[in-house]
């Protein structure tokens, strides 16, 4: 199963900005690795939450569309809420 998500570049940093994103149904994330600089991004929570239920989400290469540019990544780390079925933050590593 191929996964493809649309992402926006994240400009506001910090705890307050991250909380506002989560309250609006979005997840803060970061893409790093390779020769390019790390990029902070915003993803839709519901799309990611549904996709992460599939086992292949953790092993396959995922395509992120960031500002019209496709980036191939793999999930490096994922933080979940302690008792709610929600994602808090996700790290992607360029494939």
Curated annotation (Swiss-Prot):
Signal peptide: none
Gene3D superfamilies, per database record: Ribosomal Protein L25, Chain P
Keywords of the record: Ribonucleoprotein, Ribosomal protein, RNA-binding, rRNA-binding
Gene Ontology CC: cytosolic large ribosomal subunit
Entry's Gene Ontology molecular function annotations: 5S rRNA binding; structural constituent of ribosome
Organism domain of life: Bacteria
GO process terms (BP): translation
Disulfide linkage: none
Family: Belongs to the bacterial ribosomal protein bL25 family.
Function, in words: This is one of the proteins that binds to the 5S RNA in the ribosome where it forms part of the central protuberance.
Assembly information from the UniProt record: Part of the 50S ribosomal subunit; part of the 5S rRNA/L5/L18/L25 subcomplex. Contacts the 5S rRNA. Binds to the 5S rRNA independently of L5 and L18.
PANTHER family found in the cross-reference section: RIBOSOMAL PROTEIN L25/GLN-TRNA SYNTHETASE, ANTI-CODON-BINDING DOMAIN-CONTAINING PROTEIN, RIBOSOMAL PROTEIN L25_GLN-TRNA SYNTHETASE, ANTI-CODON-BINDING DOMAIN-CONTAINING PROTEIN
Name recorded for this polypeptide: Large ribosomal subunit protein bL25
Source organism of the structure: Haemophilus influenzae (strain PittGG)
Gene name as annotated: rplY
